[in-house]
């Protein structure tokens, strides 16, 4: 009876150990499967050869994939360098075109300004003789009587308006008397000896010269000193008479004697 109980306990302990250690059972089963597979491969040489071929093909595919990746990487780098060069070339072309356009725009603006000044100079040059006639009339008129003085004041009002318009346009008279002769500003129409003025000094203004915003609008016609010496015969005087007073003084209106 005791022997039967002990044998039963021994069987239960073996069953419990097998149930409590499933990992050991899995390892043992895996080892048994591997041993079976090895036995099968060793027993079947064709299967073993096929497995080896599959391993070689897998290695070749991996090597080929690696080579293709390297080739693609080198191609991408070369393409990137090419694109960078093209970008630099296009950027240089853009900068040149932008600079050319900027120069063209500046040149167009300058040409338009020059054309505008030329047209203004041409127009004002046609008006200046009218100003000269006003000044001559002012010098020659000596109004007597209330009616003549009223007419003279009306005439002076028109003259002042004309002078103001010229000033607003940037026209300014030159100051030439007692100045050194400058061919860029003056045109000498007469020369005569002078004991008071040194040589090449403007003695008299025969026709007023004008500036337009710093440019010469009209040269002044002047008489120039030859320095001390014997009296000389004057050269021909131009048709237009002299205007001895500045344009700004003329704007102030007639003097008390004229009124």
Curated annotation (Swiss-Prot):
GO process annotations (BP): protein folding
Region (Disordered): 1-75, 227-259
Subcellular location: Cytoplasm
Domain of life where this protein originates: Bacteria
GO molecular function: adenyl-nucleotide exchange factor activity; protein homodimerization activity; protein-folding chaperone binding; unfolded protein binding
Compositional bias segments (type: Polar residues): 61-73
Coarse class of the protein's main subcellular location: cytoplasm
Record's GO cellular component terms: cytoplasm
Biased composition (Low complexity): 20-40
Biased composition (Basic and acidic residues): 46-60
Keywords associated with the record: Chaperone, Cytoplasm, Stress response
PANTHER family, alphabetized: GRPE PROTEIN, GRPE PROTEIN HOMOLOG, MITOCHONDRIAL
Function in brief: Participates actively in the response to hyperosmotic and heat shock by preventing the aggregation of stress-denatured proteins, in association with DnaK and GrpE. It is the nucleotide exchange factor for DnaK and may function as a thermosensor. Unfolded proteins bind initially to DnaJ; upon interaction with the DnaJ-bound protein, DnaK hydrolyzes its bound ATP, resulting in the formation of a stable complex. GrpE releases ADP from DnaK; ATP binding to DnaK triggers the release of the substrate protein, thus completing the reaction cycle.
Family stated for the protein in its record: Belongs to the GrpE family.
UniProt-recorded name of the protein: Protein GrpE
Organism: Prochlorococcus marinus (strain NATL1A)
Lineage: Bacteria, Bacillati, Cyanobacteriota, Cyanophyceae, Synechococcales
